[in-house]
Amino acid sequence: MPWIQLKLNTTGANAEDLSDALMEAGAVSITFQDTHDTPVFEPLPGETRLWGDTDVIGLFDAETDMNDVVAILENHPLLGAGFAHKIEQLEDKDWEREWMDNFHPMRFGERLWICPSWRDVPDENAVNVMLDPGLAFGTGTHPTTSLCLQWLDSLDLTGKTVIDFGCGSGILAIAALKLGAAKAIGIDIDPQAIQASRDNAERNGVSDRLELYLPKDQPEAMKADVVVANILAGPLRELAPLISVLPVSGGLLGLSGILASQAESVCEAYADSFALDPVVEKEEWCRITGRKN
């Protein structure tokens, strides 16, 4: 069915209030969109992370009288009479099909493919991870996830234990298992991430080799041959003493979620414990790898 879209521009601080106002005016759904295409990262549990300059978009039934909607919104203290907005008639589409059509199998390195479940696998002899895109966690489309997947693909993981620190969807741990690791351990602060990782591991037939923990539940003295952490530069610096002890002597470390401008400060936090490789950049992001002293 056709829809009518009303778009408002506001600050991140006011976005939730205007979302409520649009719903009260009859919107059937709300979308937050970055006005300037600035990166935004996965929020903490219970938090909605928004951009400084945010578009709030309300979707209305095609029969809605938008003059009435505008009149209601003009009474909102954040808007007022003559507030700036854009109303657009959307053509009738199969929105779910259009969304699905935007996602294709993606190759990382020489062997690894990440494939949506509704697509045919491009190479049945390759290492294929089946993972559907979702709202909350990584699927390989972000440069930092791509950098980590390419790195894992370049390693001989046969028989190795891998820790995915901040596992999100479990994509890195699952990829490691499919690439030959004997065991993977996923750690995340968000119970939803733990469940997402568990579901994705079952879909890929590796759940029997994946252990998942909240930080408070992880075993003491946990060690691995390979540790990968695709989180943010701030936590990587703050957690360096904890992350640095996870690899065995001679073990490998891979860090991402880091802007290229932040690489030097993250390297400094790990330089005493690791022989670091040259930083690898992709777009404005980078990956730091090294071997435990």
Swiss-Prot record:
A single GO cellular-component term on record: cytosol
Query: Record's InterPro entries?
Result: Ribosomal_L11_MeTrfase_PrmA, Ribosomal_PrmA_MeTrfase, SAM-dependent_MTases_sf
According to the record, the signal peptide region is: none
Task: Tell me which residues bind S-adenosyl-L-methionine.
Answer: 145, 166, 188, 230
Which UniProt keywords are listed? Cytoplasm, Methyltransferase, S-adenosyl-L-methionine, Transferase
> In the UniProt record, does the keyword Methyltransferase occur?
yes
Q: Where in the cell is it found?
A: Cytoplasm
The protein's annotated catalytic reaction(s) are: L-lysyl-[protein] + 3 S-adenosyl-L-methionine = N(6),N(6),N(6)-trimethyl-L-lysyl-[protein] + 3 S-adenosyl-L-homocysteine + 3 H(+)
Superkingdom to which the source organism belongs: Bacteria
Specify the enzyme's EC class, one word: transferase
UniProt-listed Enzyme Commission number(s)? 2.1.1.-
- CDD domains in the record: AdoMet_MTases
Gene Ontology MF: a single term: protein-lysine N-methyltransferase activity
What processes does the entry annotate via GO biological process terms?
Answer: methylation
Q: Which NCBIfam families match?
A: prmA
Q: Which family does it belong to?
A: Belongs to the methyltransferase superfamily. PrmA family.
Q: What does this protein do?
A: Methylates ribosomal protein L11.
**Entry protein name:** Ribosomal protein L11 methyltransferase
Q: What is the source species?
A: Escherichia coli (strain SMS-3-5 / SECEC)
